[in-house]
Protein backbone atom coordinates (compact mmCIF):
# COMPACT_ATOMS: atom_id res chain seq x y z
CA UNK A 1 0.00 0.00 0.00
CA UNK A 2 1.43 3.39 -0.97
CA UNK A 3 2.10 5.98 1.73
CA UNK A 4 -0.71 8.30 0.59
CA UNK A 5 -3.18 5.40 0.70
CA UNK A 6 -2.08 4.63 4.25
CA UNK A 7 -2.57 8.25 5.30
CA UNK A 8 -6.01 8.43 3.73
CA UNK A 9 -7.12 5.12 5.24
CA UNK A 10 -5.86 6.09 8.70
CA UNK A 11 -7.65 9.45 8.67
CA UNK A 12 -10.78 7.93 7.13
CA UNK A 13 -10.95 5.38 9.95
CA UNK A 14 -10.27 8.02 12.58
CA UNK A 15 -13.00 10.30 11.23
CA UNK A 16 -15.51 7.44 11.18
CA UNK A 17 -14.67 6.49 14.78
CA UNK A 18 -14.30 9.98 16.29
CA UNK A 19 -17.60 11.23 14.86
CA UNK A 20 -19.52 7.92 15.03
CA UNK A 21 -20.26 7.97 11.30
CA UNK A 22 -20.76 4.24 10.75
CA UNK A 23 -23.10 2.10 12.83
CA UNK A 24 -24.20 -1.50 12.65
CA UNK A 25 -27.08 -1.89 10.22
CA UNK A 26 -26.46 1.34 8.29
CA UNK A 27 -27.57 1.47 4.67
CA UNK A 28 -25.42 4.17 3.10
CA UNK A 29 -25.89 5.87 -0.25
CA UNK A 30 -22.77 7.54 -1.64
CA UNK A 31 -23.27 10.68 -3.71
CA UNK A 32 -20.92 9.94 -6.60
CA UNK A 33 -20.11 13.01 -8.68
CA UNK A 34 -17.22 11.39 -10.52
CA UNK A 35 -14.54 13.60 -8.98
CA UNK A 36 -11.51 12.20 -7.18
CA UNK A 37 -13.03 12.69 -3.72
CA UNK A 38 -16.24 10.76 -4.33
CA UNK A 39 -14.32 8.03 -6.19
CA UNK A 40 -12.01 7.59 -3.22
CA UNK A 41 -15.03 7.56 -0.90
CA UNK A 42 -16.52 4.69 -2.94
CA UNK A 43 -13.26 2.77 -2.69
CA UNK A 44 -12.92 3.26 1.07
CA UNK A 45 -16.54 2.53 1.98
CA UNK A 46 -16.52 -0.55 -0.26
CA UNK A 47 -13.53 -1.84 1.70
CA UNK A 48 -15.21 -0.95 4.99
CA UNK A 49 -18.41 -2.78 4.01
CA UNK A 50 -16.44 -6.03 3.77
CA UNK A 51 -15.56 -5.84 7.48
CA UNK A 52 -17.89 -7.82 9.74
CA UNK A 53 -18.51 -5.14 12.39
CA UNK A 54 -20.12 -2.74 12.15
CA UNK A 55 -22.06 -4.34 9.32
CA UNK A 56 -22.98 -1.73 6.71
CA UNK A 57 -24.47 -1.84 3.23
CA UNK A 58 -23.18 0.63 0.67
CA UNK A 59 -24.47 1.71 -2.74
CA UNK A 60 -23.83 4.79 -4.87
CA UNK A 61 -25.91 7.24 -6.88
CA UNK A 62 -24.83 9.50 -9.74
CA UNK A 63 -27.21 12.30 -10.71
CA UNK A 64 -27.48 13.57 -14.27
CA UNK A 65 -28.99 17.03 -14.72
CA UNK A 66 -30.80 16.76 -18.03
CA UNK A 67 -30.86 20.50 -18.74
CA UNK A 68 -27.21 21.27 -17.93
CA UNK A 69 -24.73 20.86 -20.84
CA UNK A 70 -21.94 18.95 -19.18
CA UNK A 71 -20.77 15.37 -19.44
CA UNK A 72 -19.40 12.69 -17.15
CA UNK A 73 -17.96 9.34 -18.15
CA UNK A 74 -20.88 7.22 -17.04
CA UNK A 75 -19.37 3.94 -18.24
CA UNK A 76 -16.21 4.62 -16.21
CA UNK A 77 -18.27 5.26 -13.07
CA UNK A 78 -20.24 2.06 -13.63
CA UNK A 79 -17.04 0.05 -14.14
CA UNK A 80 -15.38 1.66 -11.11
CA UNK A 81 -18.31 0.80 -8.85
CA UNK A 82 -18.53 -2.73 -10.23
CA UNK A 83 -14.82 -3.29 -9.57
CA UNK A 84 -15.40 -2.23 -5.96
CA UNK A 85 -18.52 -4.36 -5.55
CA UNK A 86 -20.83 -1.35 -5.27
CA UNK A 87 -24.17 -1.02 -7.01
CA UNK A 88 -24.50 2.27 -8.91
CA UNK A 89 -27.83 4.00 -9.50
CA UNK A 90 -28.06 6.56 -12.32
CA UNK A 91 -30.66 9.21 -11.42
CA UNK A 92 -32.01 12.00 -13.62
CA UNK A 93 -33.14 15.44 -12.52
CA UNK A 94 -33.69 18.91 -13.97
CA UNK A 95 -34.93 22.35 -12.98
CA UNK A 96 -36.90 25.24 -14.42
CA UNK A 97 -35.12 28.58 -14.06
CA UNK A 98 -38.34 30.50 -14.63
CA UNK A 99 -39.84 29.29 -11.34
CA UNK A 100 -37.66 31.73 -9.40
CA UNK A 101 -35.47 34.10 -11.47
CA UNK A 102 -33.82 35.36 -8.26
CA UNK A 103 -32.07 32.01 -7.82
CA UNK A 104 -28.86 31.22 -9.70
CA UNK A 105 -28.47 28.15 -11.88
CA UNK A 106 -25.99 26.75 -9.36
CA UNK A 107 -28.45 27.14 -6.49
CA UNK A 108 -31.30 25.52 -8.42
CA UNK A 109 -29.08 22.72 -9.67
CA UNK A 110 -27.71 21.95 -6.19
CA UNK A 111 -31.16 22.13 -4.59
CA UNK A 112 -32.67 19.74 -7.13
CA UNK A 113 -29.72 17.36 -6.92
CA UNK A 114 -30.14 17.15 -3.15
CA UNK A 115 -33.90 16.67 -3.42
CA UNK A 116 -33.48 13.87 -5.99
CA UNK A 117 -30.82 12.18 -3.87
CA UNK A 118 -32.76 12.46 -0.60
CA UNK A 119 -36.02 11.19 -2.07
CA UNK A 120 -34.30 8.24 -3.74
CA UNK A 121 -32.53 7.37 -0.48
CA UNK A 122 -35.73 7.45 1.57
CA UNK A 123 -37.72 5.48 -1.01
CA UNK A 124 -35.06 2.77 -1.15
CA UNK A 125 -34.43 2.25 2.54
CA UNK A 126 -31.17 4.12 3.08
CA UNK A 127 -30.63 5.88 6.40
CA UNK A 128 -27.41 7.74 5.59
CA UNK A 129 -25.99 9.68 2.65
CA UNK A 130 -22.21 9.87 2.38
CA UNK A 131 -20.65 12.95 0.80
CA UNK A 132 -17.04 13.29 -0.34
CA UNK A 133 -16.08 16.53 1.43
CA UNK A 134 -12.58 16.35 2.91
CA UNK A 135 -10.90 18.44 5.61
CA UNK A 136 -9.80 21.14 3.15
CA UNK A 137 -13.39 21.59 1.90
CA UNK A 138 -14.68 21.94 5.43
CA UNK A 139 -12.04 24.48 6.47
CA UNK A 140 -12.36 26.57 3.30
CA UNK A 141 -16.12 26.71 3.93
CA UNK A 142 -15.37 27.86 7.49
CA UNK A 143 -13.17 30.67 6.17
CA UNK A 144 -15.82 31.68 3.64
CA UNK A 145 -18.53 31.80 6.30
CA UNK A 146 -16.37 33.85 8.65
CA UNK A 147 -15.34 36.28 5.90
CA UNK A 148 -18.61 36.75 4.04
CA UNK A 149 -21.32 35.81 6.54
CA UNK A 150 -19.79 36.62 9.92
CA UNK A 151 -20.63 33.07 10.97
CA UNK A 152 -18.22 30.72 12.71
CA UNK A 153 -19.75 27.62 11.15
CA UNK A 154 -19.10 25.01 8.48
CA UNK A 155 -20.13 21.58 7.20
CA UNK A 156 -20.42 18.96 9.93
CA UNK A 157 -18.98 15.42 9.88
CA UNK A 158 -22.48 14.18 10.71
CA UNK A 159 -25.75 16.04 10.26
CA UNK A 160 -29.28 14.64 10.80
CA UNK A 161 -31.73 16.17 8.32
CA UNK A 162 -34.84 17.93 9.60
CA UNK A 163 -37.25 17.04 6.81
CA UNK A 164 -36.01 13.56 5.87
CA UNK A 165 -35.24 10.47 8.00
CA UNK A 166 -31.63 10.67 6.87
CA UNK A 167 -28.23 11.63 8.24
CA UNK A 168 -25.53 13.23 6.11
CA UNK A 169 -22.08 11.82 6.88
CA UNK A 170 -18.68 12.97 5.62
CA UNK A 171 -16.25 10.08 6.19
CA UNK A 172 -13.36 12.01 4.56
CA UNK A 173 -13.70 14.85 7.09
CA UNK A 174 -10.17 14.35 8.49
CA UNK A 175 -8.51 13.48 5.17
CA UNK A 176 -6.22 15.99 3.45
CA UNK A 177 -6.99 16.84 -0.16
CA UNK A 178 -3.32 16.50 -1.16
CA UNK A 179 -3.33 12.86 -0.07
CA UNK A 180 -6.52 12.12 -2.02
CA UNK A 181 -5.00 13.79 -5.08
CA UNK A 182 -1.90 11.60 -4.79
CA UNK A 183 -3.99 8.43 -4.42
CA UNK A 184 -6.07 9.44 -7.44
CA UNK A 185 -2.91 9.92 -9.52
CA UNK A 186 -1.30 6.66 -8.44
CA UNK A 187 -4.48 4.62 -8.90
CA UNK A 188 -5.22 6.40 -12.21
CA UNK A 189 -8.67 7.73 -11.41
CA UNK A 190 -10.28 9.14 -14.56
CA UNK A 191 -11.44 12.76 -14.42
CA UNK A 192 -14.81 13.99 -15.67
CA UNK A 193 -14.92 14.65 -19.41
CA UNK A 194 -16.16 18.19 -18.90
CA UNK A 195 -17.01 20.37 -15.93
CA UNK A 196 -20.26 22.25 -15.57
CA UNK A 197 -20.09 25.48 -17.63
CA UNK A 198 -22.05 27.38 -14.96
CA UNK A 199 -19.99 26.33 -11.97
CA UNK A 200 -19.40 29.22 -9.57
CA UNK A 201 -15.84 28.80 -8.35
CA UNK A 202 -14.35 32.29 -7.99
CA UNK A 203 -15.08 32.98 -4.33
CA UNK A 204 -14.19 29.45 -3.22
CA UNK A 205 -11.05 29.43 -5.37
CA UNK A 206 -9.97 32.72 -3.81
CA UNK A 207 -10.51 31.33 -0.31
CA UNK A 208 -8.59 28.17 -1.18
CA UNK A 209 -5.65 30.43 -2.00
CA UNK A 210 -6.05 32.14 1.39
CA UNK A 211 -6.10 28.73 3.08
CA UNK A 212 -2.84 27.77 1.35
CA UNK A 213 -1.27 31.04 2.51
CA UNK A 214 -2.33 30.29 6.09
CA UNK A 215 -0.62 26.92 5.86
CA UNK A 216 2.53 28.60 4.60
CA UNK A 217 2.47 30.91 7.63
CA UNK A 218 1.76 28.03 9.99
CA UNK A 219 1.93 24.38 8.85
CA UNK A 220 -0.40 23.53 11.74
CA UNK A 221 -3.02 26.11 10.72
CA UNK A 222 -5.56 23.52 9.55
CA UNK A 223 -5.54 21.82 12.95
CA UNK A 224 -5.98 25.13 14.77
CA UNK A 225 -8.93 26.00 12.54
CA UNK A 226 -10.43 22.55 13.07
CA UNK A 227 -10.14 22.80 16.86
CA UNK A 228 -11.78 26.22 16.81
CA UNK A 229 -14.97 24.61 15.47
CA UNK A 230 -15.06 21.02 16.60
CA UNK A 231 -13.20 21.11 19.92
CA UNK A 232 -14.28 24.49 21.30
Regions found by a protein language model. Name each.
Residues 48, 107-116, 149-154, 206-223:
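Short, structured secondary-structure boundary patches
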Residues 220-232:
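A short, charged, Gly/Pro-tolerant segment at domain boundaries
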Residues 94-97, 131, 195-199, 221:
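Short, surface-exposed helix-loop/turn micro-motifs enriched in polar/charged residues
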Residues 89-95, 121, 159-164, 200-204, ...:
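Short C-terminal domain-edge/linker segments immediately following a structured domain
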Residues 65-67, 95-97, 159, 175, ...:
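Residue-level detector of flexible, active-site-proximal loop/helix-junction positions
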Residues 136-216:
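Catalytic subdomain that performs nucleotidyl-dependent activation
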Amino acid sequence: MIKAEQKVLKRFNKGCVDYHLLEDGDRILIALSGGKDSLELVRLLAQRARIFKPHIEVEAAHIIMDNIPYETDRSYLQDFCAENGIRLHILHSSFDESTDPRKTRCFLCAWNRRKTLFEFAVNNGFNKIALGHHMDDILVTLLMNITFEGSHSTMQPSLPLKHYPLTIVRPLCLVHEADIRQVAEELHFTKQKALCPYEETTRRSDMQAVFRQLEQLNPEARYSLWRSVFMA
